[in-house]
Amino acid sequence: MADNKTTTIEPINRRSANITQGKSRAPNRSMYYAMGYVEGDFVKPMVGVANGHSTITPCNSGLQKLTDAAIEGIEEAGGNAQVFGTPTISDGMAMGTEGMKYSLVSREVISDCIETCVSGQWLDGVLVVGGCDKNMPGGLMGMLRANVPAIYVYGGTILPGHYQGRELNIVSVFEAVGENAAGKLSDHDLREIEKRAIPGTGSCGGMYTANTMSSAFEALGISLPYSSTMANPHDEKTNSAKASAKVLIEAIRNDLKPRDIVTRKAIENAVAVIMATGGSTNAVLHFLAIAHAAGVPWSIDDFERVRQKTPVLCDLKPSGKYLAVDLHRAGGIPQVMKLLLNAGLLHGDCITIEGKTMAQVLKDVPDRPRADQNVIRPIDQPLYAQGHLAILKGNLSPEGAVAKITGLKNPVITGPARVFDDEQSALQAILDGKIQAGDVMVLRYLGPKGGPGMPEMLAPTGALIGAGLGESVGLITDGRFSGGTWGMVVGHVAPEAAAGGTIAFVHEGDSITIDARQLLLQLNVAEAEIARRRARWTAPAARYTRGVQAKFAFNASSASQGAVLDAY
């Protein structure tokens, strides 16, 4: 008997047809003809390519070849590539200056650019190419807001530099500044380290923020397997960009969208991988924002829940030995994920951009890491039994604060507060030898509203490490830390000082306790005295009254909510 059922096939240009089909769209099509389109192109999908190429930073200066490869892949697969630009800020270059306050702002600008171009131009899909830290969360947030089929192409990691038999990376230079100030490193060696630390294109080489977020994107399933740990100069990175474009065309055909992929279970997978690889504290802030863009319930306490059951399996910088290129050679993120999956710590049923489940993607990955490498540990021989990114609470951070707690020789410190209302004066105090072992530095008015923009504190923390104080001095801030930071440091303190959080009421010499075991951040001052200080406190005047910084300060939510601008 004949099957009388009919199958409706959705056109692959289902969105762009709004501006390319019908007589009334003749003026619209004339604009395309001006760019070399022919009549047959209007039945093909219009595929955006958000190109983050920039000569501002080595993180992004190698992206054009990836964009070109993606364009080629789109066209070979039957699509029309439409390229538009997205900006970047170099965190490494802006670090320690007023420019660093624009870093987190750029996350929002990037997401706005992508949402605006994709939605305004009725694009059928988008491929995002990015490199530096905020390119990743900004890109994915824009993809999720627009919610058309999309894939992320990470620009790739940088190769290590070398000097006197030692491997170098960008954090080596920040720490060398502290060593030089402490008289432990000559001016000549400082200059040589400066020149040799970054030998070419790519993002900073350890499990810092860019590599953390790219690894997490692979774990989400929004990027291709193995792509997150490839080096930018290598041909496989370019080939991966082209392959990503072809996968995207299939996703457009199947109408597989980012919000189908970035679910609560997928975010749990990503956070488990962040914990297992020893990733950046910034991932906490960014995944709160990503979940918000995806419409997924996710709180700061969810990170602590995942942390407590996930071991650290990878020995990676900043606190470990190895770089992302070493992780790639050892089996990459798929090897880490397979170990977690077999241990029941991943959701194998999550869908990926290829249309496969994560379990299917990992099917042929070995059950145990290779014996000839030391980067990835077996699940029964972890580096640490629990994850490293802990959420600390107490009267200094009732909404939470973020700390890296693994590998600390002194997980508890109680000491006198050394209070600074800006980063530069704190850095100068370290370089001048005014900070002593046992002190607890308090850097405040550096949160989302107070900074504004929640700048990273790599210059002070790097100087502490270089001066030999990384294990003996505590540092807390309502700002952020670079992915390259390690030591007894606590960031993202919420509520922030500018919002009247307790951190605003700390006085020089007050006793503060950081207890990584009890997950406690406490001002050891009587509640009655804190209440008196609160009653006398007035919010400082806004540091910016015009432009993007003023808009960010006015609209930003608490760090405990991701410092997003649309939490209305």
From Swiss-Prot:
N6-carboxylysine modifications at: 134
Residues at which [2Fe-2S] cluster binds: 59, 132, 204
Reactions catalysed, as given in the entry: (2R)-2,3-dihydroxy-3-methylbutanoate = 3-methyl-2-oxobutanoate + H2O; (2R,3R)-2,3-dihydroxy-3-methylpentanoate = (S)-3-methyl-2-oxopentanoate + H2O
Record's cofactor remark: Binds 1 [2Fe-2S] cluster per subunit. This cluster acts as a Lewis acid cofactor.
Cofactor(s) annotated in UniProt: [2Fe-2S] cluster; Mg(2+)
Catalytic residue positions: 482 (proton acceptor)
Keyword tags: 2Fe-2S, Amino-acid biosynthesis, Branched-chain amino acid biosynthesis, Iron, Iron-sulfur, Lyase, Magnesium, Metal-binding
Residues at which Mg(2+) binds: 91, 133-134, 456
Enzyme class: lyase
Pathway membership, UniProt: Amino-acid biosynthesis; L-isoleucine biosynthesis; L-isoleucine from 2-oxobutanoate: step 3/4; Amino-acid biosynthesis; L-valine biosynthesis; L-valine from pyruvate: step 3/4
GO MF annotations in UniProt: 2 iron, 2 sulfur cluster binding; dihydroxy-acid dehydratase activity; magnesium ion binding
Magnesium among keywords: yes
Domain of life: Bacteria
GO BP field: isoleucine biosynthetic process; L-valine biosynthetic process
UniProt cross-references to PANTHER family, sorted A to Z: DIHYDROXY-ACID DEHYDRATASE DAD (PTHR21000), DIHYDROXY-ACID DEHYDRATASE, MITOCHONDRIAL (PTHR21000:SF5)
General function of this protein: Functions in the biosynthesis of branched-chain amino acids. Catalyzes the dehydration of (2R,3R)-2,3-dihydroxy-3-methylpentanoate (2,3-dihydroxy-3-methylvalerate) into 2-oxo-3-methylpentanoate (2-oxo-3-methylvalerate) and of (2R)-2,3-dihydroxy-3-methylbutanoate (2,3-dihydroxyisovalerate) into 2-oxo-3-methylbutanoate (2-oxoisovalerate), the penultimate precursor to L-isoleucine and L-valine, respectively.
Family affiliation: Belongs to the IlvD/Edd family.
Protein's recorded name: Dihydroxy-acid dehydratase
Lineage: Bacteria, Pseudomonadati, Pseudomonadota, Betaproteobacteria, Burkholderiales
